[in-house]
């Protein structure tokens, strides 16, 4: 019951009902109806326990993501929806049609006006995600050229001292008095078009002095040189392709519904600070508690199965 306050956590208070052999499998006697009822009860209870700055994450497959989203909209309110994060899997069930390789992570806030959020970043590496548009190189001699196919693939070393760069847009859709002006460059007077430049006249002169300006022939406008090290990180977005649930020798999959540790880690880091309290109402083997402990969060983990509780207790 949601309002029940006399819950005990001693050994004698755990259920004495016979355990199923499939201790880590989800089983629903009435199918979708059982699942929906289970979800509503636990989400309502979870919302009651959340801090005003708190978040809730629900990982789910494509079969029921639409049902779960509808239920969470009802319990938390549509206005408190934050994101649906796509989680890449390495395998999919055999099917006659297109293979499904994504799970979904639904993210809601208790109060979106107060929710705690900490932006995470990836390191921007040449040739990797977030850096594929860096296709030119600035050599110590002053020569600037396009990277070769072998250099782009990493099959050939980059010249020593070379700096990889891309040509980036210097115009903005917004327009103000300080950014709407014509600029004389390489014998031409060029304007920003219907919008404005991304910087003022002082900034343009600074870019020119640093050798950062280039003329774009298509569109007859000015671009600027952005080196890959200018901002060596890219913000984490809602497509996670490096959290494959296929697992490997370093992180073997031991249970049917086991979650990749990296997913849990990111959720904790995005939505909490050290000292905050993390709750996992479907304990399993205790992965969430272990990650929370590693990152200095307090934690509570619970499960209806004595098998899960016993394994988690030994692990932790």
Feature locations, PLM:
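Conserved SAM-binding motif I beta-strand of class I
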Residues: 299-303
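Short, conserved SAM-binding/catalytic segment
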Residues: 294, 313-316
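Conserved SAM-binding loop of SAM-dependent methyltransferases across substrates and taxa
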Residues: 287-297
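Class I SAM-dependent methyltransferase "Motif I" SAM/SAH-binding loop
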Residues: 282-286
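Class I S-adenosyl-L-methionine
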Residues: 1-277, 309
